[in-house]
Amino acid sequence: MQQFSTVPALRNEIISLLVEGGIDDDCYIEMLDYTIELFESHGLGSEYYGYHNINHELEVTYVTLLAAKLDSISNKITKNDLKYLYTAALFHDFDPQKSVDKPHEESVLRFISLDKNLRELIKNSNLDIEIVKALILRTTYPWTGNFKENAEKQINQ
């Protein structure tokens, strides 16, 4: 990952993997650029002291696309699946109001639901925002006890 440790390098690699996966609609690049802008404008750019900064978000997105590319050999992940995985990975930890470094999934979902620009980007990509939110909820860690129960309850709604 060291060779892609800058935001521009990660951005370029993500775009390359999207194109390789047959996803070349402008809305996905707009989503990527909007994410970078959001993180940086909320003080969560590369200089942010904590782990959950723009680099983490882009690295997770990159690794998600890379894993999906490897799995595409078995044809289990469809192009549509890839669009959902990309979108959920891109926003899985965005919580600008966080008081500690670990984001809270409910805050992430609230942001996704209320941010007008992001809702428009998701709409333009023909994705169901509820599926994106369910995928993000499934990143809850640890997946036990109250965390698991609360996430499953929200997913089932």
Label for each model-derived stretch:
Residues 1-45:
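Non-catalytic interface/linker regions that flank or bridge core catalytic/transmembrane domains
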Residues 28-36, 54, 58, 82-86, ...:
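Short, well-structured alpha-helical segments
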Residues 39-50, 89-93:
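Glycine-/proline-rich flexible loop or hinge segments
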Residues 46-84, 113, 118:
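Alpha-helical phosphate/pyrophosphate-handling elements in metalloenzyme active cores
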Residues 60, 80-99, 108, 133-142:
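His-Asp-centered metal-binding catalytic motifs of divalent-metal-dependent phosphohydrolases/nucleases
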Residues 102-117:
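Structured all-alpha helical bundle cores of eukaryotic regulatory proteins
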Residues 119-157:
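Histidine/acidic-rich helix-loop-helix segments that form or flank divalent-metal centers
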